[in-house]
Amino acid sequence: MTIQRMDHVSVVVDDLEAAIAFFVELGMEREGAAQIEGPWVDRINGLDGVRVDITMLRTPDGHGRLELTKFHHPTAVSAEPKNALGNTLGLRSIMFAVDDVDATIAGLRAHGADLVGEVA
């Protein structure tokens, strides 16, 4: 058995519309959205009474997908520390190739993003 492809990465967000706007600004395209709940969702999340809204986005080349998830029940919990260091266990980063770094940064700043350091 071998992996055929990576299907998607899932990110839990507090403000679904703001997250969608951020990634659409990067050039991702909406693929679909749904509210999901039921026993199978409880089972895969290890929680009871799960009700979430999800939006699936895809990269312009169609090879990468990102699932943005907003928990309505139970409410999402914050990971600590909020500004974790680079060596903290867990998801570290998602990286994208862009045509124009300066234009991309300017567009993302309109959505509240800021640089954490110089662009190399």
Where are these regions (language model features)?
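Vicinal oxygen chelate
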Residues: 5-14, 53-72, 79-108
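Conserved S-adenosyl-L-methionine
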Residues: 31-34, 116-120
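Histidine- and/or cysteine-centered catalytic micro-motif in compact active-site loops
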Residues: 35-36, 71-73
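A cross-kingdom feature marking solvent-exposed beta-strand/loop segments within repeated
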Residues: 38-42, 76-81, 118-120
